[in-house]
């Protein structure tokens, strides 16, 4: 063979080896960029680890997911930065939120503070309980105004987001300017309805019409005048969704992969501002990535192996079961079956406790502010409440719940919604007692709780209809005094009488 041929052959061989090396390297890079479906999106995880992480994700996510669902339901009707008014007391349908009350008219607004502040103006309201509560994406009540907190006269607030850096308008000073911990905030307005007459309803409706809530730019454009909610334009909500959200009536029913999708929505919504100093949360979110929950990435169940998917579903159900176990353990002070959520026992980082409240009463006033509540799911003997039985709750008239405003005794089905009944009666309250609409005898008020309509007219007057199966109470105390707040008030038990 000639020398030139040998050189050519060597050169060709070198090129071939070089090409092969390049192809091999390219194959490695492509494999790294497009890995085959693994049992996680973020590295290996065992079924046991996946189950544990999913349980933690449920406990952490129950409240944010509930708030996300709440915002979705309301913003479909009213958009954002606009009040949606309930012009009549809430009934069993439509279902807008768990454990509502039937003694106040609600106003609900979903605020997006990422672009500009929101203005809220409340005209002077006399001789009537009212409050406006601001709640963040963790269901924490971060600001309140109302008849218990403010002097008589007009009350206004400029609500600004955590990242807003604009110029403050004149006319707002000191306490008028409030910074939200999150770009999202829910605003919940309550105005007491002291009677069920048409005159009382019209009075409260007229007050609703004079309450203004709008963005700062809209307020300036209106000449800083009152504008009815019905005259405000509807600004559609713009946040992540996934197909099927509209068919989900309650976040409490979410199972397995659906719950994971909702947690993914929460993590990918920039308006849901996370805690900057939440050490526990930061570590938990890092763990969530191992089962596909990560900001910047939509949760995709198809990337999970069957055994990992099953483990996640089991972990979520375990978290739900552990949270609901607090119904037996209690979260505060137990008084004859009533669980008074003592503020001293409340911890913002106790996710199991928070998940419990998220499941039974998403917007529960815990810890107490303008009002507080007490939950009851069992009778005085410790047995689950059921419409198959009859019960009584007996108050001594000289030892009624100590409040400055009013108390209310609502009854809910086992999922936390009003029970649809022929009387449209969902609660009894202190206004009814004061107006003589409840029967009292021998210094006592006896409430009759049962599914069947009582034949005795006196019992019928004090009847609180219950569903055929399980039910629960979430008593409300507006303007609660110390015995309610610390749990020392001796609340009468729910006594089975059949």
Q: Where would I find each of the regions flagged by the language model?
A:
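A compositional/structural signature for long, glycine/proline-rich flexible linkers
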Residues: 34-498
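C-terminal motif of bacterial Sec signal peptides marking the signal peptidase cleavage site
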Residues: 29-32
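Short, compositionally stereotyped local motifs that mark structural "simplifiers"
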Residues: 25-26
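Bacterial N-terminal signal peptides that target proteins for export
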Residues: 3-22
């Amino acid at each position: 063979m000639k020398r030139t041929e040998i050189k050519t052959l060597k050169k060709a061989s070198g090129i071939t080896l070089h090409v092969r090396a390049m192809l091999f390297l390219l194959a490695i890079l492509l494999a790294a960029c497009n890995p085959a479906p693994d049992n996680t999106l973020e590295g290996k995880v065992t079924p046991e680890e996946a189950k544990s992480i999913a349980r933690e994700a449920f406990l952490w996510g129950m409240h944010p997911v509930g708030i996300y669902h709440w915002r979705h339901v309301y913003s479909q009707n009213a958009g954002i930065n606009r009040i949606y008014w309930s012009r009549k007391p809430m009934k069993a349908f439509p279902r807008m939120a768990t454990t509502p009350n039937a003694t106040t008219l609600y106003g609900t607004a979903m605020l997006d503070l990422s672009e500009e502040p929101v203005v809220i103006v409340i005209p002077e309201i006399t001789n009537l309980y009212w409050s406006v509560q601001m709640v963040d994406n963790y269901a924490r009540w971060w600001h309140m105004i109302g008849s218990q907190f403010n002097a008589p006269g007009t009350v206004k607030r400029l609500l600004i987001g955590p990242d807003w850096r604009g110029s403050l308008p004149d006319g707002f000073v000191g306490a008028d300017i409030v910074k939200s911990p999150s770009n999202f905030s829910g605003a919940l307005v309550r105005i007491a309805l002291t009677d069920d007459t048409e005159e009382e309803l019209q009075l409260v409706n007229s007050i609703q019409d004079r309450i203004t809530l709008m963005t700062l730019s809209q307020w300036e454009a209106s000449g800083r005048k009152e504008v009815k909610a019905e005259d405000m334009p509807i600004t559609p909500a713009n946040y992540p969704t996934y197909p099927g959200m509209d068919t989900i009536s309650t976040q409490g029913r979410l199972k397995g992969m659906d719950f994971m999708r909702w947690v993914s929505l929460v993590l990918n919504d920039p308006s849901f501002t996370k805690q900057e100093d939440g050490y526990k949360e930061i570590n938990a979110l890092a763990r969530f990535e191992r089962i596909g929950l990560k900001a910047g990435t939509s949760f995709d169940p198809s990337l999970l192996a069957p055994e990992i998917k099953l483990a996640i579903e089991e972990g979520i159900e375990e978290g739900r079961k552990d949270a609901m176990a607090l119904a037996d353990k209690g979260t505060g002070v137990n008084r004859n079956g009533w669980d008074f959520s003592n503020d001293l026992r409340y911890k913002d980082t106790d996710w199991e406790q928070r998940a419990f409240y998220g499941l039974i009463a998403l917007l529960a006033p815990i810890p107490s502010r303008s009002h507080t509540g007490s939950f009851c799911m069992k009778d005085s003997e410790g047995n689950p409440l059921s419409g198959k039985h009859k019960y009584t709750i007996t108050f001594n008239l000289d030892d009624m719940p100590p409040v400055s405003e009013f108390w209310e005794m609502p009854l809910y089905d086992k999922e936390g919604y009003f029970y649809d009944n022929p009387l449209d009666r969902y609660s009894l309250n202190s206004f009814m007692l004061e107006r003589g609409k409840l029967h009292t005898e021998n210094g006592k008020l006896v409430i009759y709780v049962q599914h069947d309509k009582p034949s005795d007219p006196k019992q019928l007057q004090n009847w609180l209809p219950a569903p055929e199966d399980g039910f629960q109470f979430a008593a409300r105390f507006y303007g609660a005094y110390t015995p309610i707040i610390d749990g020392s008030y001796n609340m009468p038990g729910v006594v089975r009488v059949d």
